[in-house]
Curated annotation (Swiss-Prot):
InterPro entries: 14-3-3, 14-3-3_CS, 14-3-3_dom_sf, 14-3-3_domain
Pfam families for this protein: 14-3-3
Residue ranges of the region described as Disordered: 237-258
Name recorded for this polypeptide: 14-3-3-like protein C
Gene Ontology CC terms, in alphabetical order: cytoplasm
Origin: domain of life: Eukaryota
Record Gene3D superfamilies: 14-3-3 domain
Family: Belongs to the 14-3-3 family.
UniProt organism field: Glycine max (Soybean)
């Protein structure tokens, strides 16, 4: 069993790595903490999340750029360029798959078993939903469906616990609603369901705004603003009665997430 000092050292290294923007090393340091089979503190959870979000975020951005260039070259009929771009895109997809697989293992084998119910449980099931959603962004066919199904189940589990145990203004519950609604919009191509979920979360939080603690006020109101921004963006995609629904399933960035 690692000593408290070793645990503190891993956390300190993670903080240093974050400051130096060396996110792969930040992730490794926090994986060392997770592997201790201990319940993570709020600070440790956030360090782990920030590390992985930056590691995966860089690849997601690369994938979007490459996909856009690939489409433009295809439209021009530049087959040689398309072949090169596709090879490069597949390399990025392989990296994305490995990162997502890595965090799933950490969540399933260490984090969820070591966590109490309530806030930590919501946090990690939300995280699981997020990383399966990231897989569904670039997978196709059966692999995409499988990733989407896993994402849906994780978000639903997180939502059930959040609604039972967290206030409607809690930043983790709001962040979950934000990301789950993005899942409906981007992955399931359902702007109606996305808007319903986002609006419900926003309205419930507004009605309880006076109960918001000072420490979480900034985080909660920021996420509420993102929910409102997405609602504004998505409402235009909801078809009028009798009008054919037109949603671009390959949209590069359908809304903000937490």
């Amino acid at each position: 069993m690692a000593s408290t000092k070793e645990r503190e050292n891993f956390v300190y290294v993670a903080k240093l790595a974050e400051q130096a923007e060396r996110y792969e090393e930040m992730v490794e340091a926090m994986k060392n903490v997770a592997n201790l089979n201990v319940e993570l503190t709020v600070e440790e959870r956030n360090l782990l999340s920030v590390g992985y979000k930056n590691v995966v975020g860089a690849r997601r951005a690369s994938w979007r750029i490459l996909s856009s260039i690939e489409q433009k070259e295809e439209a021009k009929g530049n087959d040689v360029s398309v072949k090169r771009i596709k090879e490069y895109r597949l390399k990025v997809e392989s990296e994305l798959s490995n990162i997502c697989s890595d965090i799933m293992t950490v969540i399933d084998e260490y984090l969820i078993p070591s966590s109490s119910s309530g806030e930590p449980s919501v946090f990690f099931y939300k995280m699981k939903g997020d990383y399966y959603r990231y897989l569904a962004e670039f997978k196709s066919g059966d692999e995409r469906k499988e990733a989407a199904d896993h994402s849906m189940k994780a978000y639903q589990l997180a939502s059930t616990t959040a609604e039972a145990e967290l206030a409607s203004t809690h930043p983790i519950r709001l962040g979950l609603a934000l990301n789950f609604s993005v899942f409906y919009y981007e992955i399931l191509n359902s702007p109606e369901r996305a808007c319903h979920l986002a609006k419900q979360a926003f309205d419930e939080a507004i009605s309880e705004l006076d109960t918001l603690s000072e420490e979480s006020y900034k985080d909660s109101t920021l996420i509420m603003q993102l929910l409102r921004d997405n609602l504004t963006l998505w409402t235009s995609d909801i078809p009028e009665d009798g009008e054919e629904q037109k949603v671009d399933s390959a949209r590069a960035d359908g809304g903000d997430d937490a």
